[in-house]
Design a protein with these regions (language model features):
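Short conserved micro-motifs at the rims of enzyme active sites and ligand-binding pockets
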Residues: 67, 89-91, 101-102, 158
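Substrate-binding/catalytic subdomain of NAD(P)-dependent oxidoreductase enzymes
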Residues: 1-69, 74-76, 95
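Short acidic (Asp/Glu) and glycine-rich catalytic loops that position anionic groups and cofactors
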Residues: 6-12, 80-87, 138-139
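Glycine-rich phosphate/pyrophosphate-binding beta-alpha loops
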Residues: 85-87, 91-97
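Structured core elements
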Residues: 40-41, 55, 78, 88-90, ...
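A glycine- and small/hydrophobic-rich beta-loop-beta segment
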Residues: 76, 82-84, 113, 117-118
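A conserved regulatory-domain signal marking ACT and ACT-like small-molecule sensing domains
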Residues: 102, 107-223
């Protein structure tokens, strides 16, 4: 709905790429914090020449960004425009007071006969063309990976070689000491790359006998 308001066009809700937070583990939160990030569930909509891309998924956000510090009942909306650059709106999104205020505002509008269109303009004035997410050019971004592997010689070399073969370069590698024979998480962050290349590389990595579980993949928001 926010995308429809922002871009004055009907949005194909079925085309929104959605990943939840169920697969986020305490390990991810710990290593994200160690690397200088917080994990937040973000909904994003971007307008491109080919349409509007929409995603809802957890991302690593640098602690230096204001949106990283939105916690508790607070919600935030970040807007980026051609002339105003970036605007951040923060407010309470839960609780008796904020909910009552929103309901009261709607009731007052109804009593006054104020009935603006849901999306700010009538649907007849929205741009008729479909966003068609498949026509949106793919952008590049950095990624966080957590790979659970067996403690065997050459495992990391195989993973690094696979990423290299898909033109993905590494920025950070974290592997903590452990007892011999134990399974170990390997934490990687990459330089910006396409998600298509990343998922292709992970299909190969996850098929390795030394990789014990599907690799955790989270995008990293640029600072």
């Amino acid at each position: 709905m926010l995308a429809a308001i922002a871009f004055a066009r009907p949005v194909d809700f079925d085309a929104v790429h959605v990943d939840g937070i169920r697969h986020i583990s305490p390990l991810d939160i710990h290593y994200a914090d160690e690397l200088g990030y917080k994990i937040k569930l973000l909904g994003q909509a971007k307008r491109h020449a080919g349409g509007v891309s929409q995603t809802v998924r957890p991302q690593l956000i640098p602690k230096s960004l204001p949106v990283a510090n939105i916690d508790g009942v607070l919600n935030a909306v970040v807007m980026r425009g051609s002339f105003v650059d970036e605007v951040l709106l923060v407010g309470r999104g839960a609780g008796g007071g904020p909910t009552a205020s929103a309901v009261a505002a709607d009731l007052i509008d109804i009593a006054r006969g104020i009935a603006p269109p849901i999306f700010g303009i009538t649907t007849g004035h929205m741009q008729a063309e479909s966003p068609a997410n498949d026509t949106v050019p793919e952008s590049k971004q950095a990624y966080y990976l957590r790979v659970s592997v067996k403690d065997e010689p050459g495992v990391f070399a195989d993973i690094a070689a696979t990423l290299r073969d898909h033109a993905i370069s590494l920025e950070t590698v974290v592997q903590r000491g452990h007892e011999p024979g134990q399974n170990v998480p390997v934490i990687l962050t990459t330089h910006p790359s396409s998600e298509t290349a990343m998922r292709s590389a992970l299909a190969t990595i996850d098929a390795m006998d030394t990789v014990l579980a599907p690799t955790q993949l989270l995008p990293i928001m640029p600072a």
